[in-house]
């Protein structure tokens, strides 16, 4: 009897643990009629943006104006969206627990109220704050416009004297509200997205960096944290500044990041198989690498702007672009590569020399000058 009781307890415990690691999204529409047609929503999709691509995580039929998603919760909170409407989507944070969406009008999905879990409750608070800021801004502008003397109505330059200060006041009120919200919820992953979508368009990178520095350690492992750090570094990119971190896959599918080589000099080389000027640099790269045969202080990280695997790998093989200190990576997204955007690459070849601390030393080293510079690193005579 005792064994049966213990077994029952274990079974109940296992079921409870399984439930604890799951999410349920319950959605309800007050109307399922679309905005731009008389048709109704038949199916909705739970989607996530992965490396710039929409990935469908699950689908759900709409029955009696209701839909449900259920599954294993991600280890870290992730921003997702529900699509299937013709006038926008519903954004929410995917995490453990029951997430309630609505009731809402399918014609205006962005107006859906979201809640039920910690992150989504905080996210809804942010949406409410944003709506309140917009409402107050409109009220201030309306009051300013009503205060314009009748004799000045219709005279743009004269009207600006009344309305211009309101733009400034509205901007400052919004900034203060956003900073206060972030400070009040600094431990929540939601603030990562508030920083990205509310701070970056209106704040200087110096101010944004202050708030990024204040984020707790347990948020540093989230992909969005890395994205924020990279965006600030990209905006401030110059000699002496910290380099953005970029990642890609080697030809054999291994994931490699620039930060993997911290403690070494990295010669970051943006190129492509179809780029004739890039190919003209190959002999110089080989010459520089020949000096590093017995040295582990230097790595050449060649990031390809190719979008075709065969073109990339065949070029590497045909030109024997192989050395123990030569690493090749790419995302095969061509000019849409995030790495090219972070380093503001406008043309290739484009090179960046990065020191062991991850700071930019020099841009656009090429030819004999590049060989001489890299040789000095290998020899230990660089300054």
Task: List each model region and its residues.
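A short, hydrophobic beta-strand/beta-hairpin element that forms part of a small beta-sheet core
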Residues: 246, 349-363
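N-terminal targeting signals for export/organelle localization
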Residues: 85, 89, 99-102, 109-111, ...
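Conserved helix-turn-beta segment immediately C-terminal to the redox Cys motif
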Residues: 280-303, 379-381
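Short, internal strand/loop/helix patches
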Residues: 313-348, 356
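Bacterial Sec-dependent N-terminal signal peptides
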Residues: 1-24, 380-381
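Conserved redox-active cysteine motifs that mediate thiol-disulfide chemistry
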Residues: 262-263, 270-287
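A non-transmembrane, solvent-exposed segment enriched in polar/low-complexity residues
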Residues: 19-169
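N-terminal "domain-start" segment that seeds a small globular fold
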Residues: 224-259, 327, 372-380
């Amino acid at each position: 009897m005792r064994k049966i009781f213990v077994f029952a307890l274990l079974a109940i415990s296992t079921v409870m643990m399984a439930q604890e690691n799951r999410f349920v999204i319950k959605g309800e529409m007050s109307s399922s009629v679309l905005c731009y047609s008389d048709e109704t929503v038949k199916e909705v999709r739970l989607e996530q943006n992965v490396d710039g691509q929409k990935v469908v995580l699950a689908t759900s039929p709409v029955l009696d104006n209701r839909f449900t998603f259920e599954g294993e919760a991600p280890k870290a909170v992730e921003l997702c969206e529900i699509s299937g409407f013709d006038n926008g989507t519903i954004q929410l944070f995917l995490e453990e627990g029951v997430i309630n969406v609505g009731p809402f009008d399918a014609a205006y999905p962005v107006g859906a109220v979201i809640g039920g879990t910690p992150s989504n409750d905080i996210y809804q608070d942010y949406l409410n704050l944003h709506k309140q800021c917009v409402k107050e801004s409109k009220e201030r502008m309306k009051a300013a416009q009503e205060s314009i003397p009748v004799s000045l109505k219709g005279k743009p330059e004269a009207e600006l004297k009344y309305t211009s200060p309101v733009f400034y006041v509205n901007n400052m009120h919004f900034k203060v509200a956003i900073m206060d919200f972030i400070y009040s919820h600094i431990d929540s992953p939601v603030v990562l997205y508030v920083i990205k979508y509310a701070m970056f368009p209106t704040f200087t990178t110096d101010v944004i960096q202050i708030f990024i520095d204040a984020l707790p350690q347990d948020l540093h492992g989230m992909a969005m944290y890395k994205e924020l750090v990279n965006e600030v570094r990209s905006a401030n990119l110059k000699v002496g500044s910290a380099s953005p971190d970029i990642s890609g896959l080697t030809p054999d599918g291994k994931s490699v990041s620039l930060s993997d080589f911290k403690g070494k000099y990295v010669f970051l080389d943006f190129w492509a198989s179809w780029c004739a000027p890039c190919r003209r640099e190959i002999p110089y790269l080989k010459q520089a690498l020949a000096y590093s045969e017995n040295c582990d202080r230097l790595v050449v990280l060649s990031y390809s702007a190719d979008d075709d695997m065969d073109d990339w790998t065949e070029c590497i093989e045909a030109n024997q672009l192989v050395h123990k200190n030569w690493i090749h990576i790419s995302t095969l997204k061509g000019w849409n590569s995030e790495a090219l955007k972070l380093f503001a690459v406008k043309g290739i070849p484009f090179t960046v020399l990065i020191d062991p601390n991850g700071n930019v030393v020099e841009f656009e080293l090429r030819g004999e000058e590049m060989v001489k510079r890299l040789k000095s690193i290998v020899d230990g005579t660089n300054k």
